[in-house]
Amino acid sequence: MKKRIKELTDLLNRYRYDYYTKDAPSVSDSDYDKLYRELVTLEQSYPEYVLQDSPTQQVGGTILKGFEKYRHQYPLFSLQDAFSREELDAFDKRVKAEFPNATYLAELKIDGLSISLSYENGFLQVGATRGDGNIGENITENIKKIKDIPHQLSEPLTITVRGEAYMSRQSFKAINEARQENGETEFANPRNAAAGTLRQLDTAVVAKRELATFLYQEASPTARNQQNEVLAELADLGFSVNPYYQLTSSMDEIWDFIKTIEAKRDQLAYDIDGVVIKVNSLAMQEELGFTVKAPRWAIAYKFPAEEKEAEILSVDWTVGRTGVVTPTANLTPVQLAGTTVSRATLHNVDYIAEKDIRIGDTVIVYKAGDIIPAVLNVVMSKRNQQEVMLIPKLCPSCGSELVHFEDEVALRCINPLCPSLIQRSLEHFASRDAMNITGLGPAIVEKLFLAGFVHDVADIYQLTKENFMQLDGIKEKSADKLLAAIEASKSNSAEKLLFGLGIRHIGSKVSRLILEVYGDISALLTAKEEEIARIDGLGSTIAQSLTQYFEQKTAAILVDELKTAGVNMHYSGQKVNSDAALFGLTVVLTGKLNQLNRNEAKDKLEALGAKVTGSVSKKTDLVIAGSDAGSKLEKAKSLGIRIEDEDWLRQL
C-alpha cells in the first residue's frame, strides 16, 4: 500500500502541475477524480503512509487559533512608484549612468498580496505574509490550500521565493454573489477578498475561495544570472509564473509594452495595477543595491487611476499627531475602483488655493495609489458662483492660532496640549506598527483621554482595571485583555517604541536603522546630529528632527517614565558596532573578486560598519577594486578617492 500511495501522490501532483502551471491538462477531470478518490481511501486506511506533498493535504479544513509572527530571513522591500514616462526615463538615466548596457525585464504588477514561500530540500516549510517587510505572519496552513502552490518542488532545493496571491475576477464574482444571497457584506474588490481569505482561521474557507498565485523572485541566493532566467527556473520548479513580460534595453519598447498591457487590462482574468520594470542582470541589481525603502534596480509604473465626478458638500478639518491640519471633502457618493466613495482628501491649504477648490464645486475624484480617495481638479465648466473655501485660522480642536510655515504646504497646530494632537499621538503609539497594543484603538483612546486617564504615552502604562471599567461599554473581560496587551507591549524591541513616539520623519524602517547603530533609546538623548546623518539610508533632515526631539527636557522625562514603567529600551536585533573599522564610510565594490564572492564582501563591509553603494560619487569614501575593474575605478581615481584591493579587505 505504501508503494501505491507514493505512485498516486506523484501521478496526481504531475497532473496538477500540468493543469495549474502549464495550463495544459493531461488527464480528464473524471479520471483525475477517480485516482484522487482512490488515494483518499488508501490514506484513510493507512494514515501512517500519508506523504507530506499529498494533494489531499490541500483540501478539507483546519480551524487555526491565530497567526504567529514570522521574521523573514530575506527582507521584502517596497518598490518606488512611477506615474509618468518622465519618471521612467529618469530611472533609466540613473541605471544607464552606472551600466550603459543594462537591459530590463518588464513584468505585470499583480494587484494581490505579497507572499514569501520557504522550502527545505524541496518541501514547503513556511508560507508568510509580507508584513512590514521584516516581520510578517506565518500563514502556512492557508498557503497549503492554494492549489497552484506546490508542496514539493520538482528538485530538492532549499530556497525562498516571492510572489503575489490573488483572486480571479470569476472567483470574486461568484463569492460576492454567494455573500449577497446569504445577506453578508460583499467584498469591495478582489484584492480585499484575497487579503481576507489569506487571514481566515478556517482553512476550509481558504480552499473553497480558490486563490491563485504568480511567483516572480528567488529571494535566497541563486545560481541564475538574469531575472528572466529566474522566471524560467520558477516555472520549472512547479510554480505559476505570469506569461506576460518583455525583455529589452529600450525604454521606448517598455512604454509600448505598458500601453499594450493597459489596453488589454480588462481582458485579463485577474486585476493588475501596473507594470514592474527590473534591471535584468542580477549582478547589476546587486551593485545598484537598495535605499531604505526600495531597490534602486526596479520601479513600478502605476496605471492612471479611475476618475469620477462628484460634488463637494462640505469640508472637515482634522488635526494629526504632528499637528498638521488636513482638509477632507464630504462628497456626493460615487463608485470608484470597486468601492463607494463619499469623502476625499484635499491634501493641504496650498493645494486648495492652487486648484481654487470651493464648496459646491463639481470635482474630479480618483484614488491615489488605488487606495486613498483624493480630489484631482475642479470641473470649471460646471461652477456656478460657488462659495470660496474658508480656510480656518484657529485649530478646530483646541482653538489655538494655526501657523503656516514658509517651507511647508500645510497648516499646523503647534499647541502641545491640543486634544486632537494628543489623541492622535496616543493612537499612533498603540498602533500595530508601533507598540501594537491590541484593542487599544481610536474609540477607547478617546474615552480614556476624555475621562482624564491619559495625557501622554507614558500614562498608558499607569492604567488600571478600574480605569477601564469606568469607561462606557468596557466589561471586565475586555479590561483584562487590554491590560494584558499593554503589559505585553513592554517587551517590544526598541525600534517599535522609537517609531511609536511619533517623531517627525522617523518611520518604522528609519527607527530600526537608528537602533541598529545606537542599540538603546537612552543613547539617543545624547546622540549627535552629524553622527546620525552618517547612518546608511538617513541624512541631515532625519538627523536634525531626531536630535531636536531628544534635546527637549520633556523627551528625557518621557523616556524616564517609560523606563520606570518597565518598557524595554533595548534593540533586540543585531547591533552595528559604531567603533568598527569602517563605521560610517561609504564604500563601492567594483571588478571581479577572486577569494570572496560579492555577497561575502558586502556582508563583511557592512559588519565593519560601512555603507555599500553601487555608484562612485563625491560622497564615496573608499573603493574596493577587484580585477577587470572599469569605469568606477577610473572615476574613483579622478575624484581622488581612496582605493584598496580584495587582500586588504580580507585582512581587516
Swiss-Prot record:
One of its GO terms (cellular component) is cytosol. One of its GO terms (biological process) is DNA replication. Keywords: DNA damage, DNA repair, DNA replication, Ligase, Magnesium, Manganese, Metal-binding, NAD, Zinc. It catalyses: NAD(+) + (deoxyribonucleotide)n-3'-hydroxyl + 5'-phospho-(deoxyribonucleotide)m = (deoxyribonucleotide)n+m + AMP + beta-nicotinamide D-nucleotide. InterPro entries: BRCT_dom, BRCT_dom_sf, DisA/LigA_HHH, DNA_ligase, DNA_ligase_AS, DNA_ligase_CS, DNAligase_adenylation, DNAligase_N. It is an enzyme of class 6 (ligase). Its EC number is 6.5.1.2. This is DNA ligase. One of its GO terms (molecular function) is DNA ligase (NAD+) activity. Zn(2+) binds at residues 395, 398, 413, 418. The gene is ligA. Signal peptide: none annotated. Residues 577-652 form the BRCT domain. Belongs to the NAD-dependent DNA ligase family. LigA subfamily. The keyword Cell wall biogenesis/degradation does not apply. Its cofactor is Mg(2+); Mn(2+). The active site is at residue 109. PROSITE patterns: BRCT (PS50172), DNA_LIGASE_N1 (PS01055), DNA_LIGASE_N2 (PS01056).
